[in-house]
Amino acid sequence: MIQAQTYLNVADNSGARELMCIRIVGASNPRYAHIGDVIVAVIKEAVPNMPLERSEVIRAVIVRTCKELKRDNGIIIRYDDNAAVVIDPEGNPKGTRVFGSIAGELRHLNFTKIVSLAPEVF
Amino acid sequence: MPVPLCMKSIVASPESLGARPLSLLNDMRRPDFRHSVTGRLGPIRSITTINGPEATVTDGSATSPDITMPPRIKFKRPDKTAKHIMQILDKEAVEEVRKEREIPDIRPGYIIQMKVVVPENKRRVSVLKAIVIARRNAGLNSTFRVRRLVAGVGVEAVYPLYSPNIMEIKVLDKKKVRRAKLYYLRDKINPLKK
């Protein structure tokens, strides 16, 4: 359940370290974002000498939440932190590597590139 | 019309409720069994009041409107209640699953290795080595919670114990814990398994 002002870790090597969510993308003005939702975020902390800099507004897709993700087969998944992957307006990740396990739901939401880069899809 | 003898055995106090089927069996050996069964099927269900036998027998022919009946307190036979029936169904379903697959005893503190079919991945996730941190018993819907470290991030997952997606569960190690729910492991960086 990510909302505005939520800090998120970054799960790729795009150059950002920490993001703060400022807006959830969606026509119905959603209050919370879950795994697979796109958010608009500002970079609060960045790795030096990379294309992305601090206080830059970018879009990201949420890949890990502390709030449980429920599946139809009864399996419930819960991560220990909130994390996102920085993407461009088309939905392609800006980085070249993705860290951590990625939920399989992202594949159905057309984030296939992120899923293919993931070390483990669960 | 004399009350047939079998009627007296049916008009019972609530203590002999459980023995009622037996009394019916006894009646079957009697010569006038046919008469008794065709005569009265009503009171068998309604003899559940606590007030006393004389209040319950309603002879269809003989009640006069002057007799005031005390209020009936109905309660169901325990083996007819929905709760009991659901318990039986649940046990049957659990036994059916246990016949197909061998599901070991899983308790918190066990380190298990499971093979799960993940439909999203279209393949088996083979080595899921995790520590069981909780177990919830609810018949067929029993679930257990496992925790593992994936690429530096802790992941907890709740699985239904009798889920067909779980191919195999193997207990690797049993750690001594003094809790039923090991949620304190979330704060510890180094889970027990190391």
Curated annotation (Swiss-Prot), chain A:
GO biological process: translation
Cellular component aspect of the GO annotation: chloroplast; cytosolic large ribosomal subunit
Metal-binding in keyword set: no
InterPro entries registered for this protein in UniProt: Ribosomal_uL14, Ribosomal_uL14_bac-type, Ribosomal_uL14_CS, Ribosomal_uL14_sf
Recorded GO MF terms: large ribosomal subunit rRNA binding; structural constituent of ribosome
Complexes and interactors: Part of the 50S ribosomal subunit.
Protein name: Large ribosomal subunit protein uL14c
